[in-house]
Amino acid sequence: MSKALLKFVRLSPTKARLIARQIQGMNAELAIASLEFTPNKAARVLSKVVASAVANGSLDAKSALIVSCRVDAGPVLRRSIPRAKGRATAIRKPTSHVFVEVVEGKEMKSSKSHKKNQAEGK
């Protein structure tokens, strides 16, 4: 199992989680290919993190499976914008921490059946 972590990326966690849910459980090569054609900033960021996780474990992208893809909220950068009558309102610029775990294809099947057995109570 290999992991990759990207912290403090200027990206909304809610928007990134939409893309992260789509690639969870996918083949790494297929996930990277599908993320290339997704017109979203989160897709570009997640594609790089998945590629990094595959490279960290020196795995082949064709046989690697994404076990978990998690996006956690980072600190929020607070900025202000001038408004009428001398006031200022706050602008929130959220950041995210992206975490990806990748395993070889054969290991994934055993862990999936293990999770299924746990869910059934066996």
UniProtKB/Swiss-Prot annotation:
A cellular-component GO term for this protein: cytosolic large ribosomal subunit
Listed Gene3D superfamilies: Ribosomal protein L22/L17
Domain of life the protein comes from: Bacteria
Disordered: annotated span: 103-122
PROSITE patterns: RIBOSOMAL_L22 (PS00464)
GO biological process: translation
GO MF: rRNA binding; structural constituent of ribosome
Pfam family, one: Ribosomal_L22
CDD domains associated with the record: Ribosomal_L22
Annotated keywords: Ribonucleoprotein, Ribosomal protein, RNA-binding, rRNA-binding
Function: This protein binds specifically to 23S rRNA; its binding is stimulated by other ribosomal proteins, e.g. L4, L17, and L20. It is important during the early stages of 50S assembly. It makes multiple contacts with different domains of the 23S rRNA in the assembled 50S subunit and ribosome. The globular domain of the protein is located near the polypeptide exit tunnel on the outside of the subunit, while an extended beta-hairpin is found that lines the wall of the exit tunnel in the center of the 70S ribosome.
The protein's assembly and partners: Part of the 50S ribosomal subunit.
UniProt record similarity statement: Belongs to the universal ribosomal protein uL22 family.
HAMAP family: Ribosomal_uL22_B
Protein name: Large ribosomal subunit protein uL22
